[in-house]
Amino acid sequence: MRRNAKGGSTMKVFLNAGHAPDGNPDPGACGYGLRECDVAKNVADLVAGYLTAAGVEVVGCLQSDSLREVVSASNRADADVFISVHCNACNGSANGTETWHYYGSTEGEKLAQCIQNQIADALGTVDRGVKGAKPGVNGLYVLSNTDAVAVLVELAFIDHAGDAELLRSQQDEFARAIACGVTDYEGAC
C-alpha cells in the first residue's frame, strides 16, 4: 500500500497549470508562437494521466488567474503534494529548468529536487537548480499559502529558441518527468 507525506494510504496530488485559462486575461510568458498558459495546461493534464496510471490520486487540476482560488482548492482537497506548472522567460537570454519550493521546507526541497533531476535527465535541459522562495523577497504565493508540500516547476524558457522547441515538441516528456519525480519523492527520491 502506498504511503503519502501525511501518513495516509494514497498520495493525493493537486496540479495547477500556470496562468489564465485560454490566456484571458493573462497568457503568461510568450515566445516562438507559444503561450505559457497553453503549454502549462497541456503538461499538467498529461501529468495527471501519468500519475493516475501510477496509482497516485490526482485531487485537482486547476488553471485559474486567481491564485487564491488555486490555493483554496488545493487546501480544500487536502492534497499532500501541490505542483504548479509554468514556463520561464528572460528576453531570450537564458535557458533551462528550475524548480521552486517554499524556503525552509525540507519536504518541498526534496520534492523539487526529485522533479528537477527527472526533467534535466530526461530532456537534457540546463539544470538551473532547485530554489527556495522566501516570503517578502521572492515568495511565490502558491508556495507560501498552500498546506501541501508545494513546488513550482519552470519547465524551460519559452522565449529561448532551443527551449521553446522542447516546450513545443516534448510536452509529453516533460509530463512523464514530473510524474516520475513525484513517484521518486513518494519513494523518498
Residue ranges of model-derived segments:
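Loop/turn elements at helix/coil->beta-strand transitions in domains of secreted/extracellular proteins
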Residues: 10-11, 51-57, 77-82, 122-126, ...
